[in-house]
């Protein structure tokens, strides 16, 4: 290798050193100085891992003074190069720049520059880069992008709502599904889609204080969304880091009380430029025209500043038309400004609902009914569709579905309100109650008497709360070490039940963490029963481990002992037996407990066991829940309303459980109230709204499509290849689970999403649902997305060289595989990837410019190739550099046609889809006032910006592979 003082070379193994200069040459060694780092390297002359840097006409080079030059001619004299060309800053031509004065901070970013500079990648990295481009482009085009990555069952009605709302600009909707139908999951799916597509970047979730951790866990575990929980302490800390503390995080959860309590805090929240606001338990926002509550006013103020708003409530509108109106008013105050007018409008929807029922029944329609449908829909060319719907042809059913869809678009609050009911959603189990009446021990009787005397001044509510938990009253007098479990008959019953049902998984819920911990110790020490504990004092990781141990079929825990707060947000539908060691204070909490098992997808009827002590508040409550509300064996949408109306009476009975006079009458009255309200709910069910919210066959097809994608073997192969190349260790643990741990030779020292201790992953949705300690890997998981970013945002795999052993071709035949990327730059919120994601175009050129890519498929070709070490590769590249340059020019001439075709197709698709959506909403605006002006404006603006961005789309060479034919 001939070296001359002043020549510029680059290290093949340490490219980060920049451009080196030969400063010393002797018989056996050569010394290079790398000015950008100030370091020297001594190499053997005969076989040094360095590559001569030589630029060609057409290249742009930078001088050590910072100015740039377009090379037009290269001269060599005594082994040193001089570049002649035109300066780009002054446009002076004929400028000469000797190679010694080249900028030393040279970075080769173009694939061809890296190849010619000897920066040759491993062949498997090139293949990974191409696959990453290909799969990434395909995923963006999927119609349900953003709906596949969550750790949830594929439930059609949830997917339907999320798919509809998640694609809207700044959605403002009310999610009002009945308890247990998954409003939190629907909201999470909508957030996930909006964040993934770039439609939203900053999200604020406001919930009651007791639900903060539930939301935190749900968002992280199900959607891989890492929210920050803001309380007084966190807010005070963040004030040191920013003028507005909420600017320090993109995704924030806080309580309603936290937001409402301080005027300055509320102002900071309003100024923080959120894209989406989510409010859970919105039925607690009390409103009347004369006196809205402070909570309502706080949310109203926020809703005025935040473009997208999701309100969640389980309270049906029939149980309070005024509060229902108040919630809709938060979403669109211009549309919902007059309560009296709103009530009148609601009455007018009855004929529409009847028309939908008529169409769905499938009976022949009379002329009057056809005329009424025509008037309701109000389209000029509706006649053929009406005739088709009333015919006996094969198209009749689809015509009726289309008419139903048109009716739902044009009438009612279906764009702002979604409500599914258990009657409309199939797949729920039965619930069977087993009450076990037990005697009240004398120890408790004594403690309760003394407590009654000492707590005479306590309020009835405090006394009632105390009476629900006699073991705690006993401990107050006997101290924390009091062994109440030695005489409490509920403990004996529980041990007997568990030992006689060893094969069953049993969920035991009690109000307090201390009770759960004490029960675990007793079960373990007395009967050797394996019990996991789950309470609010544990970290999320500890809870995951406990849940995973409970989920294990053979070696797992038989029992999971949960505290009230600790179990929030967790579902264990693989179990069907529940024991309530005590009872919660209100019907909402009771439903929440049962909801841990009573989910869609539960395979067995739920057995609810309630051991209770006679003559205690528990005996009062168990009767009231069961006989007064039927709340154990059926969901109870009337529970909160009745609870509020009889609260004072109920509290008195709970505080003095031995005084039962009039209690039977109270139960009878509550049951009558319950039946009347239930009938009112059933009669007032908005069938139109339920049909729209449910999604029908369309939602079912969506769930099936995603289920098919779950079996994508390309993902597993790609992920394993990705982990190998990044340097992540993989340990197969069986049961479709793999443990990933960082290695000492990773591409990056700290890979996002991979902790030092490692993580457990699975590609199987069912395993992920059963094992909360295993992360569910899909194309949308941060681990895969971070891996794609790592590969595609850098140079990994962008230049390589391979040998093709093929005796049918002459030795030395050259082929160049080019991967171009066609792309457009635009702000993320335009969601340009729907139409033109960065799309790879593969070309396989011979020296005459013939493109063989169509005949030679990538994976088949890749398997026929052999790798070349970097040193040999550099020699090969130097030998054929001129030929490669010529082939590259032929490639540049050919790519334009393919790229233009892709760009034109994207423009046509964008124009067609966005114009159609705009036209549809403009037509509906005439008959349905629930379509907001700002939504129409946003779609028109979005269309214009998308078209402008696509007009400026271009292409670039992303990767290349040089292939040399050999016979050896």
UniProtKB/Swiss-Prot annotation:
Residues that bind ATP: 177-184
GO function terms (MF aspect): ATP binding; DNA binding; helicase activity; hydrolase activity, acting on acid anhydrides
PROSITE patterns documented for this protein: HELICASE_ATP_BIND_1, HELICASE_CTER
Broad EC category: hydrolase
Signal peptide feature range: none
Enzyme Commission number(s): 3.6.4.-
GO biological process: regulation of DNA-templated transcription
Protein keywords: Activator, ATP-binding, DNA-binding, Helicase, Hydrolase, Nucleotide-binding, Transcription, Transcription regulation
Position of sequence motif DEAH box: 280-283
Keyword match Kinase: no
Sequence ranges assigned to domain Helicase C-terminal in this UniProt record: 490-662
Start and end residues of each Helicase ATP-binding domain: 164-334
Role according to the record: Transcription regulator that activates transcription by stimulating RNA polymerase (RNAP) recycling in case of stress conditions such as supercoiled DNA or high salt concentrations. Probably acts by releasing the RNAP, when it is trapped or immobilized on tightly supercoiled DNA. Does not activate transcription on linear DNA. Probably not involved in DNA repair.
NCBIfam families in alphabetical order: PRK04914.1
Subunit structure: Interacts with the RNAP. Has a higher affinity for the core RNAP than for the holoenzyme. Its ATPase activity is stimulated by binding to RNAP.
Similarity field: Belongs to the SNF2/RAD54 helicase family. RapA subfamily.
Protein name, per record: RNA polymerase-associated protein RapA
């Amino acid at each position: 290798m001939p070296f001359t003082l002043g020549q510029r070379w680059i290290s093949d193994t340490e490219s980060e050193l920049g451009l080196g200069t030969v400063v010393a040459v002797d018989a056996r060694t050569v010394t290079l100085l790398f000015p950008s780092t100030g370091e020297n390297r001594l190499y053997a002359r005969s076989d040094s891992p360095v590559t001569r840097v030589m630029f060609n006409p057409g290249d742009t080079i930078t001088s050590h003074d910072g100015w740039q030059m377009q090379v037009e001619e290269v001269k060599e004299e005594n082994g040193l190069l001089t570049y002649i060309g035109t300066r780009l800053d002054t446009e002076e031509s004929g400028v000469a720049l000797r190679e010694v004065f080249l900028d030393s901070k040279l970075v080769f970013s173009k694939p061809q520059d890296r190849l010619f500079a000897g920066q040759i990648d491993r062949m498997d990295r090139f293949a990974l880069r191409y696959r990453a481009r290909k799969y990434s482009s395909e995923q963006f085009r999927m119609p349900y992008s953003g709906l596949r990555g969550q750790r949830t069952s594929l439930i059609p009605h949830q997917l339907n709502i999320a798919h509809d709302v998640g694609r809207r600009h700044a959605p403002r909707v009310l999610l009002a599904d009945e308890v247990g139908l998954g409003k939190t999951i629907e909201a999470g799916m909508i957030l996930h889609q909006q964040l993934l597509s770039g439609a939203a970047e900053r999200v604020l979730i406001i919930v009651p204080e007791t639900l903060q951790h539930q939301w935190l866990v749900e968002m992280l575990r199900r959607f891989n969304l890492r929210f920050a929980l803001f309380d007084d302490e966190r807010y005070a800390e963040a004030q040191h880091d920013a003028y507005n503390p909420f600017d320090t995080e993109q995704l924030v959860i806080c309580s309603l009380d936290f937001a409402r309590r301080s005027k300055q805090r509320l102002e900071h929240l309003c100024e923080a430029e959120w894209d989406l606001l989510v409010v859970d338990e919105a039925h607690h926002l009390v409103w009347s025209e004369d006196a809205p509550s402070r909570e309502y006013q706080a949310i109203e103020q926020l809703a005025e500043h935040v473009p997208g708003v999701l309100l969640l409530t389980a309270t049906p509108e029939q149980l309070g038309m005024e509060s229902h109106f108040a919630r809709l008013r938060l979403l669109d105050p211009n549309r919902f400004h007059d309560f009296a007018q709103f009530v009148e409008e609601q009455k007018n929807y009855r004929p529409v609902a009847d028309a939908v029922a008529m169409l769905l029944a499938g009976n022949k329609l009379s002329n009057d009914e056809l005329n009424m449908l025509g008037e309701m829909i109000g389209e000029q060319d509706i006649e053929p569709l009406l005739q088709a719907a009333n015919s006996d042809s094969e198209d009749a059913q689809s015509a009726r579905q289309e008419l139903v869809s048109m009716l739902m678009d044009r009438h009612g609050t279906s764009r702002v309100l979604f409500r599914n009911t258990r009657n409309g959603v199939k797949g729920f189990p039965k619930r069977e109650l087993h009450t076990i009446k037990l005697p009240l021990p004398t120890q408790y009787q004594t403690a309760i008497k003394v407590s009654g005397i000492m707590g005479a001044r306590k309020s009835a509510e405090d006394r009632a709360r105390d009476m629900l938990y006699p073991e705690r009253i006993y401990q107050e007098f006997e101290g924390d070490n009091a062994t109440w479990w030695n005489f409490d008959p509920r403990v004996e019953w529980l041990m007997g039940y568990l030992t006689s049902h060893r094969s069953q998984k049993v969920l035991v819920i009690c109000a307090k963490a201390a009770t759960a911990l004490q029960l675990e110790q007793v079960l373990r020490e007395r009967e050797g029963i394996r019990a996991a504990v789950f309470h609010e004092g544990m970290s999320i990781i500890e809870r995951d481990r406990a849940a995973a141990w409970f989920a294990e079929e053979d070696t797992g825990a038989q029992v999971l002992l949960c505290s009230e707060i600790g179990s929030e947000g967790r579902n264990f539908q693989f179990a069907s037996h529940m024991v309530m060691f005590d009872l919660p204070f209100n019907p909402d909490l009771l439903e929440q407990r049962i909801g841990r098992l009573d989910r869609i997808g539960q395979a067995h009827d739920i057995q609810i066991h309630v051991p209770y002590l006679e003559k205690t508040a528990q005996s009062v409550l168990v009767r009231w829940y069961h006989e007064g509300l039927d709340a154990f064996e059926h969901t109870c949408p009337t529970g909160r309303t009745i609870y509020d109306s009889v609260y004072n009476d109920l509290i008195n009975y709970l505080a003095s459980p031995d005084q039962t006079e009039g209690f039977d009458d109270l139960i009878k009255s509550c049951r009558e109230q319950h039946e009347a309200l239930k009938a009112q709910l059933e009669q007032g069910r908005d069938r139109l709204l339920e049909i729209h919210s449910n999604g029908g066959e369309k939602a079912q097809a969506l769930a099936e499509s995603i289920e098919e994608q779950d079996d994508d073997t390309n993902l597993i192969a790609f992920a394993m290849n990705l982990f190998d190349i990044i340097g992540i260790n993989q340990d197969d643990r069986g049961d479709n689970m793999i443990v990933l741990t960082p290695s000492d030779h990773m591409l990056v020292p700290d890979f996002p999403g991979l902790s030092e201790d490692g993580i457990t992953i699975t590609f199987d949705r069912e395993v992920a649902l059963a094992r909360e300690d295993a992360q569910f890997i899909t194309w949308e998981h941060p681990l895969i997305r971070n891996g794609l970013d790592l590969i595609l945002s850098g140079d990994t795999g962008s230049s390589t060289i391979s040998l093709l052993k093929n005796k049918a071709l002459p030795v030395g035949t050259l082929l160049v595989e080019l991967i171009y990327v066609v792309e457009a730059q635009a702000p993320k919120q335009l969601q340009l990837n729907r139409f033109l994601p960065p799309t790879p175009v593969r070309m396989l050129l011979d020296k005459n410019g013939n493109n063989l890519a169509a005949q030679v498929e990538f994976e088949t070709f890749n398997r026929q190739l052999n790798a070349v070490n970097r040193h040999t590769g550099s020699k090969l590249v130097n030998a054929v550099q001129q030929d490669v340059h010529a082939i590259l020019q032929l490639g540049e001439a050919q790519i334009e046609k393919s790229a233009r075709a892709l760009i034109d197709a994207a423009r046509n698709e964008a124009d067609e889809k966005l114009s159609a959506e705009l036209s549809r909403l403009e037509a509906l605006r005439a008959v349905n006032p629930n379509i907001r002006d700002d939504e129409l404006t946003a779609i028109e603006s979005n269309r214009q910006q998308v078209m402008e961005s696509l007009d400026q789309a271009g292409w670039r060479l992303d990767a290349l592979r040089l292939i040399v034919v050999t016979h050896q």
